[in-house]
Amino acid sequence: MRYWYLRLAVFLGALAMPAWWLYQAWIFALGPDPGKTLVDRLGLGALVLLLLTLAMTPLQKLSGWPGWIAVRRQLGLWCFTYALLHLSAYCVFILGLDWGQLGIELSKRPYIIVGMLGFICLFLLAITSNRFAMRKLGSRWKKLHRLVYLILGLGLLHMLWVVRADLEEWTLYAVVGASLMLLRLPSIARRLPRLRGRPGVS
């Protein structure tokens, strides 16, 4: 397997954070509401992994190193895993598995609907991130996986609605996301490989 060391690093890094958070919860180091803290951290982790996934193509074009693309799918699947854990933690720690409360939560907190839409789109990408789906869907596969841009928008909107007035951290992620989208514009994406030959760019 090519770039096995990079794949292993991604695996260990993505696995380490939830393990560390669970350990912190075990020793009561997550504050007065550890359940909510876990929900928040898993959601933020999913957003960070989504941004990392989107960064792989521009990095490959800029550096010419194929290793970035080698872990793109892996990062995307970890993003889905974190989102699934985020949703599961919400159901357990916030809802308390009281499904009757879900309707009330949806009416009081519309950002949950936004988050669910993003999760459904992410689920579609996760189950089609394999060679069989690529062959089966053909040209439709690329169109389907453009949902990643919608997912990013929904994720940022979901986070914005949650943080409300505390916009400093959200702005950072929004700027990174917008920058990654700009790098995918055809007029800019075509120029990225040319930068490799310029002085100061390796």
Swiss-Prot record:
<feature type="transmembrane region" description="Helical">
    <location>
        <begin position="169"/>
        <end position="189"/>
    </location>
</feature>
<comment type="function">
    <text>Part of the MsrPQ system that repairs oxidized periplasmic proteins containing methionine sulfoxide residues (Met-O), using respiratory chain electrons. Thus protects these proteins from oxidative-stress damage caused by reactive species of oxygen and chlorine generated by the host defense mechanisms. MsrPQ is essential for the maintenance of envelope integrity under bleach stress, rescuing a wide series of structurally unrelated periplasmic proteins from methionine oxidation.</text>
</comment>
<keyword id="KW-0479">Metal-binding</keyword>
<dbReference type="GO" id="GO:0005886">
    <property type="term" value="C:plasma membrane"/>
</dbReference>
<keyword id="KW-0349">Heme</keyword>
<feature type="transmembrane region" description="Helical">
    <location>
        <begin position="147"/>
        <end position="167"/>
    </location>
</feature>
<feature type="transmembrane region" description="Helical">
    <location>
        <begin position="42"/>
        <end position="62"/>
    </location>
</feature>
<dbReference type="InterPro" id="IPR022837">
    <property type="entry name" value="MsrQ-like"/>
</dbReference>
<keyword id="KW-0249">Electron transport</keyword>
<dbReference type="GO" id="GO:0016679">
    <property type="term" value="F:oxidoreductase activity, acting on diphenols and related substances as donors"/>
</dbReference>
<keyword id="KW-0285">Flavoprotein</keyword>
<comment type="subunit">
    <text>Heterodimer of a catalytic subunit (MsrP) and a heme-binding subunit (MsrQ).</text>
</comment>
<dbReference type="GO" id="GO:0046872">
    <property type="term" value="F:metal ion binding"/>
</dbReference>
<keyword id="KW-0288">FMN</keyword>
<keyword id="KW-1003">Cell membrane</keyword>
<keyword id="KW-1133">Transmembrane helix</keyword>
<keyword id="KW-0408">Iron</keyword>
<dbReference type="GO" id="GO:0010181">
    <property type="term" value="F:FMN binding"/>
</dbReference>
<dbReference type="GO" id="GO:0020037">
    <property type="term" value="F:heme binding"/>
</dbReference>
<dbReference type="InterPro" id="IPR013130">
    <property type="entry name" value="Fe3_Rdtase_TM_dom"/>
</dbReference>
<comment type="similarity">
    <text>Belongs to the MsrQ family.</text>
</comment>
<feature type="transmembrane region" description="Helical">
    <location>
        <begin position="75"/>
        <end position="95"/>
    </location>
</feature>
<keyword id="KW-0997">Cell inner membrane</keyword>
<feature type="transmembrane region" description="Helical">
    <location>
        <begin position="8"/>
        <end position="28"/>
    </location>
</feature>
<keyword id="KW-0472">Membrane</keyword>
<dbReference type="GO" id="GO:0030091">
    <property type="term" value="P:protein repair"/>
</dbReference>
<keyword id="KW-0813">Transport</keyword>
<dbReference type="GO" id="GO:0009055">
    <property type="term" value="F:electron transfer activity"/>
</dbReference>
<dbReference type="Pfam" id="PF01794">
    <property type="entry name" value="Ferric_reduct"/>
</dbReference>
<keyword id="KW-0812">Transmembrane</keyword>
<feature type="transmembrane region" description="Helical">
    <location>
        <begin position="110"/>
        <end position="130"/>
    </location>
</feature>
<protein>
    <recommendedName>
        <fullName>Protein-methionine-sulfoxide reductase heme-binding subunit MsrQ</fullName>
    </recommendedName>
</protein>
